């Protein structure tokens, strides 16, 4: 999944934001479960970007 920037997120409406948030949380959960099973993080940079994107989406949702 491509990382979303603030400008792209601000162009979305509420329904799109909620859908994107659900997708990001599901993707993050998959990374967490993989790393728990393997004992090592597959791609820590990607996990960090997903967390930050989730935070961006939540921040913009709260602004609206």
From Swiss-Prot:
Parts forming coiled coils: none
Keyword Ribonucleoprotein: yes
GO MF assignments: structural constituent of ribosome
GO terms, biological process: translation
Entry keywords, A to Z: Ribonucleoprotein, Ribosomal protein
Domain of life from the UniProt record: Archaea
CC per GO annotation: ribonucleoprotein complex; ribosome
NCBIfam families: L29
Family in the record: Belongs to the universal ribosomal protein uL29 family.
HAMAP family membership: Ribosomal_uL29
Protein name: Large ribosomal subunit protein uL29
Gene encoding the protein: rpl29
């Amino acid at each position: 999944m491509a990382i979303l920037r603030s400008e792209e997120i601000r162009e979305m409406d509420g329904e799109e934001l909620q859908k994107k948030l659900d997708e990001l949380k599901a993707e993050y959960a998959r990374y967490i479960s993989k790393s728990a099973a393997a004992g090592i993080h597959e791609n820590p940079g990607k996990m960090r970007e997903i967390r930050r994107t989730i935070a961006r989406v939540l921040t913009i949702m709260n602004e609206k």
